Amino acid sequence: MWSLLLLAALVGQGFALKNVFDMRIQLPHSVNFGETSVSGYTEFPPLSLQEAEQLVPESSCNMDNHQSLSTINKLTKVIWRKKANQESANQNSFEVVESEVSFKGLCMLKHRMVEESYRNRRSVICYDLACNSTFCKPTVYMIVPIHACNMMKSCLIGLGPYRIQVVYERTYCTTGILTEGKCFVPDKAVVSALKRGMYAIASIETICFFIHQKGNTYKIVTAITSAMGSKCNNTDTKVQGYYICIIGGNSAPVYAPAGEDFRAMEVFSGIITSPHGEDHDLPGEEIATYQISGQIEAKIPHTVSSKNLKLTAFAGIPSYSSTSILAASEDGRFIFSPGLFPNLNQSVCDNNALPLIWRGLIDLTGYYEAVHPCNVFCVLSGPGASCEAFSEGGIFNITSPMCLVSKQNRFRAAEQQISFVCQRVDMDIIVYCNGQKKTILTKTLVIGQCIYTITSLFSLLPGVAHSIAIELCVPGFHGWATAALLITFCFGWVLIPACTLAILLVLKFFANILHTSNQENRFKAILRKIKEEFEKTKGSMVCEICKYECETLKELKAHNLSCVQGECPYCFTHCEPTETAIQAHYKVCQATHRFREDLKKTVTPQNIGPGCYRTLNLFRYKSRCYILTMWTLLLIIESILWAASAAEIPLVPLWTDNAHGVGSVPMHTDLELDFSLPSSSKYTYKRHLTNPVNDQQSVSLHIEIESQGIGAAVHHLGHWYDARLNLKTSFHCYGACTKYQYPWHTAKCHFEKDYEYENSWACNPPDCPGVGTGCTACGLYLDQLKPVGTAFKIISVRYSRKVCVQFGEEHLCKTIDMNDCFVTRHAKICIIGTVSKFSQGDTLLFLGPMEGGGIIFKHWCTSTCHFGDPGDVMGPKDKPFICPEFPGQFRKKCNFATTPVCEYDGNIISGYKKVLATIDSFQSFNTSNIHFTDERIEWRDPDGMLRDHINIVISKDIDFENLAENPCKVGLQAANIEGAWGSGVGFTLTCKVSLTECPTFLTSIKACDMAICYGAESVTLSRGQNTVKITGKGGHSGSSFKCCHGKECSSTGLQASAPHLDKVNGISELENEKVYDDGAPECGITCWFKKSGEWVMGIINGNWVVLIVLCVLLLFSLILLSILCPVRKHKKS
């Protein structure tokens, strides 16, 4: 029994989980003016017709539901059934039954209900039903004031057995509607629709509810008659009211019809032309079968005497709403017609109805919200980095190849904030945000962590510890050189003798080994000579008894005496006088080396004479003179090494730290430069061209080449749509195929294949006795249309760069294209060729804001498009909707006593879904600084994927006598500095530069300290005051950065901040991509000493307490030296 209860509980939980659905309501992250409401809907699986009539919506949200929806609403229920007498079955063998039914919470909104709910902070929750004769599919709609997003994140709605989790999702739009990944703001002015070239057009989903209200201003049938051009009588006595609509799930109420609002005009047109709207098919119901019984008329309400509504009876999956309102009565006769399609065709005046709820796409004019750039910050967090991205107008797309970017976003005020974690900081962090490539230099994060660690260890003196830490934590050799320099200065008087002693011990150890080895080799040589001499004069030195080879004569005599007597000649132990016994004894005897040692004592001196070992023993490593000499020498060497290593290694070889000045080129021959330049890079070349005959005559040359601009003349193809393909079989037993109008006939894209008068007993359902009388209609149509992107076809593409040349006082500029040249009297600059991935005829597809880049299609259909091709469903801007062709073949599948079913062997997957499945096979491109119209797109490539082949030739024929004098005078002043020295991010120096004596002057301004320049900016100066910002990387704590032009610098400099733990800002790649070459000399020995002196002066002028602490440590080391190594006292003789 308990097992059964447990099983029931588990099954009940599983059933409950299946009945929980999501309703996601998208809303902008700012509340705009007006009575803006947001809406959403959710469709559910079918219920029985009896259960559907008992539904009541419930809500657990903290906003009250509007009370009027809890009232009971009465409708006329119309159902159809077969006639009782089936003896002579024909096309009229069925009948309708009218009755009154009551619903609670049905979407029968009252006048001013939505407006009142906005003012009272209440929600409107209702439902609609799509039914056949046996079951219904409910759809729940919810309208809430936009303030709900500030009051709740989610809530729960109940409808019968179903539960709806309402989730409010903030988009990155400020106030607009999210469509195609862009934020669209509709414009209601009619003039914007007339001047479409000035505005964008977007397809927006709209939900409309009919409001019944009597009054002269609400004669909706009169408006329909006027729009359709039909001549209907007695329109004053027909239904009165209006539609209230929410556009894109986020808008103020739109009232239709309204002649002064273009949005209302488009909505009203959509309701008239496609009154059924979008179908209610659930996933898996794309392929379905209808059996049409025929047309019939009914009485609305059931108490009237004459029939006033035409309907079409069917059996099959319900796809469209079963609620409507009778058009012929001004009293508001609401209809519930399960299993019947009401006649919604407004081209006829009688026996028709209006939809109670309408949902569909409409084309609206308006504009897209601007895309704002991103700010990305990172801080070190554990083994990785914690980063945040901000954007004023929201973030539409953020990705990173090395970070974990969550899609759960949160907002802060008017900006959108996204936090994410990067697991590795051993390489720079790259983030793509709102179409911009940001690089966070993690070197600075590591510097900050190092500073924090050292400061924490010496927390008693935090100021001093921080000043020392910022010197020690510079990455690379420079940091180690700094550590060595500080240690030598503070503890050198103790470490020098200690290290010297350790070195002497090691050297003496090796000297002793070498001395012993030399003695042993010398002794072996003596033995060898003695043995050879003995063998020459007296014979063998082998004992005759034991056969042992002796080394000396004394040893041989001992063998001759002892071996005969059976004794060991070495230890005098008794043993048998046989060779085997004595040889075995020798192996264990401990005195076999006795005669060898005696001889060694005789021939080897016992004391070690003067040599390396004795010299090492006599070395006076404790001498104060030696320690002072080494201390001073080490400080000088380490200072030079420290200064030489103070330059930062750049990310890419775009800037190389060098000394002041500009390089010179003697013009013996023409000066030619030939190189390849990435599309994202700028190029600056500056030299002094000198007269080969007279070095005193020179002309300044400055060439600046801007980054590549890409301009494409395009044809705006329109919006590309994703869609769902439906295959519906409609069978009716009697009549021609043209007898009935099916709901899919009002879809934008549909195709029908008819099999007329082909039914027989082998292809009929049991209730159809006719033979050769009916029709099987196979309908293909597209629904759930959703715009996904914008397509442009390239007519021509142009790659260009702006080139400026300053030759002496001559200043010229020109924008040149591929295979074009800029020719002056002395210079010729050409773009010989461009390596590109764009070509004429390509199609550019933007799946979102154009700032985010796009995809290149080499094959995009424009004329004959099949469903499933790229570009299959298109909505051109100023042309009718373009539908694809369906090239597959239809087949009618028949079985005995079974309703025929249509089969289609063509493709059923949309082109957009196919592209998404294989998107990695297409070429993509990123864009920056994009500007676009319907006819032209201009942008820059931030990734440097394209390259230009550039050739520069400077003629040697220069009139140096007339061009050597340059009248332009430049004045410099350092105004402000931001950033940090020595860090990966660098600093930005703001310079005030004045120009006199000439109107314009192209030159470069550098950011330098006393010795080295760390960055430059090529700029065209105008007469008067100019502001120039220079970005540089490197320097040290003593660097005073000045604005320099050539060898002249501003009188005062500014010091940058130290690297610290503040957030590291991302660098835009376009701002950082520049190649600068002015031929300035590299830093030499004099430059190194300048850097060292500037550093020392910086410490003295800055935190002088550091110097005092270092001197105290030096004094401590001297005292420690006197204790450990006291001065030797010499006694007077």
Curated annotation (Swiss-Prot):
Residues 505-626, 1126-1133 are cytoplasmic. Belongs to the hantavirus envelope glycoprotein family. Disulfide bonds join C61-C155, C107-C126, C131-C136, C173-C183, C208-C245, C232-C349, C374-C433, C378-C387, C403-C422, C450-C473, C733-C768, C737-C775, C749-C883, C763-C894, C778-C902, C804-C813, C821-C830, C861-C865, C968-C998, C991-C1043, C1008-C1013, C1044-C1049, C1083-C1087. It comes from the Viruses. Residues 514-531, 586-603, 590-601, 609-623, 1120-1133 are annotated as: Binding to the ribonucleoprotein. Residues 755-775 are annotated as: Fusion loop. This is Envelopment polyprotein. The keyword Cell inner membrane does not apply. It comes from Seoul virus (strain SR-11) (Sapporo rat virus). InterPro entries: Envelope_glycoprot_Hantavirus, Gc_C_bunya, Gn-B_hanta, Hanta_Gc_N, Hanta_Gn-H, ITAM_motif_hantavir-typ. Pfam families: Hanta_Gc_C, Hanta_Gc_N, Hanta_Gn-B, Hanta_Gn-H, ITAM_Cys-rich. The lineage of its organism: Viruses, Riboviria, Orthornavirae, Negarnaviricota, Polyploviricotina. Residues 1-16 form the signal peptide. The record marks A646, A647 as: Cleavage. One of its GO terms (molecular function) is zinc ion binding. Residues 609-632 form the ITAM domain. One of its GO terms (biological process) is symbiont-mediated suppression of host innate immune response. The chain crosses the membrane at residues 485-504, 627-647, 1106-1125. Residues 17-484, 648-1105 are lumenal. A motif (YxxL) lies at residues 613-616. One of its GO terms (cellular component) is host cell surface. The keyword 4Fe-4S does not apply.
